[in-house]
Regions:
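Amphipathic, Lys/Arg-enriched alpha-helical "gate/interface" segment within cytosolic domains
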Residues: 1-130
C-alpha cells in the first residue's frame, strides 16, 4: 500500500480501485488543497477514476468553497463514488449538507465505520471502466 502525505491529508492507495483520504486534525480545507488531493490521485492512477473513502480528523472542516469544488462536475473526472466515514453527529450534519446541497454527480454514502464503507465501495467497482 502506497501513501502520500499532503499538508491537510494523507492519501492511501488501498488497491487498484480504492483510495482512502484522511483529512488531518484541526484543519480548514480549501479548494486548492482539494485539487492537490485530486492531482495526486490522477497522477498515481494515470487519469483512471477511483472509489474514494473519506475520513476526517477532529476539529477539521471544509470551507463552503472546498465542498463546492469537491462536488463540482470536474471532480467526477477523478472520483467514481465516495464513501464518507462520519465520526459524530456534527460531522454527519456537515456531510449531509455536502451531499444534499452540493449534489455531486456520483454515488455517495455515509458510514459509521471503515469496514461498512469498504463493503459498499466493493459494490461500486462496476463504475470504474477497465
Amino acid at each position: 500500500m502506497r501513501s502520500v502525505e499532503l499538508e491537510v491529508c494523507t492519501i492511501e492507495f488501498l488497491d487498484q480501485d480504492v483510495v482512502h483520504t484522511h483529512f488531518k486534525d484541526h484543519r480548514s480545507v480549501q479548494p486548492d488543497q482539494v485539487q492537490a488531493m485530486f492531482d495526486v490521485i490522477a497522477e498515481d492512477r494515470h487519469g483512471r477514476k477511483v472509489l474514494l473513502m473519506v475520513s476526517v480528523g477532529e476539529g477539521t472542516s471544509m470551507s463552503n468553497e472546498a465542498r463546492a469544488y469537491a462536488s463540482a462536475d470536474d471532480s467526477n473526472r477523478y472520483i467514481a463514488a465516495d464513501a464518507i466515514i462520519v465520526r459524530d453527529f456534527g460531522h454527519q450534519l456537515a456531510a449531509n449538507v455536502f451531499v444534499r446541497h452540493h449534489k455531486p454527480g456520483r454515488p455517495i454514502q455515509l458510514f459509521g465505520d471503515q469496514a461498512s464503507a469498504m463493503a459498499w465501495l466493493d459494490t461500486q467497482r462496476h463504475l470504474i471502466a477497465s
